[in-house]
A protein has these predicted regions:
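Short acidic/glycine-enriched loop/turn segments that link adjacent beta-strands
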Residues: 58-61, 131
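Acidic-basic catalytic patches of nuclease active cores, encompassing PD-(D/E)XK
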Residues: 2-54
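Conserved catalytic cores of phosphodiester-cleaving nucleases, focusing on short active-site segments
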Residues: 44, 63-86, 95, 101
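Hydrophobic residues on conserved beta-strands that form the core of alpha/beta folds
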Residues: 51-53, 75, 120
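Mid-chain, well-packed structural core segment of small domains
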Residues: 86-116
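Structural motif
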Residues: 60, 73-75, 117, 135
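Domain-level recognition of nuclease-like catalytic cores that cleave nucleotide substrates
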Residues: 1, 5, 111-148
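Short, glycine/acidic-enriched loop or turn micro-motifs at the edges of active sites
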Residues: 56-58, 80
Length: 148
């Protein structure tokens, strides 16, 4: 968690908690990316997060999920990959994506007048052939100054 007003920084993932949801056939019907987001919403709710927004857009920026927990606003980027995919979800969060997330985060916190802590989290979802998903959730991949 980075308090408002500090300079953003990239953080390498340390320990990654995992979750597996077997029998997720209802997710498969909507496509891999949307299924990964739906699975992530369910996972977040089951872990005490309150979902505030889904697919929130500002200009040409988008945040997959905005949620709160324990007084912290979480901007969750969801990356869904087939099990064993060559590019990792963490590698997909390049400089351009980090900049876009930062702009969207700042815009959202200005609009909502959110004055508490914010953080960007990564939900790396692996889609298995049997219809199950594996969640690798990395909190705080990037700090953020949401104020201006």
């Amino acid at each position: 968690i980075v308090p408002q007003g500090q300079v953003p920084a990239v953080v390498q993932p340390t320990e990654v908690p995992e979750a597996v949801l077997p029998g997720a056939e209802e997710y498969i019907e909507i496509g891999r990316g949307a299924a990964g987001e739906a699975f992530t919403v369910d996972w977040l709710r089951s872990n005490g997060f309150i979902i505030v927004e889904r697919n929130w857009r500002y200009e040409h920026y988008e945040v997959d999920i905005i949620a709160t927990r324990r007084g912290v606003m979480h901007f969750v980027e969801v990356k869904t990959r087939a099990l064993g995919s060559i590019e990792s979800a963490f590698e997909a969060i390049n400089t351009t994506k980090r900049t876009a997330l930062l702009h969207a985060m700042r815009a959202y916190t200005r609009r909502t007048r959110w004055a508490s802590d914010v953080q960007v989290d990564l939900a790396a979802v692996e889609a298995c052939l049997d219809g199950s998903f594996i969640m690798h959730y990395t909190p705080g991949i990037m700090g953020g100054d949401a104020g201006d």
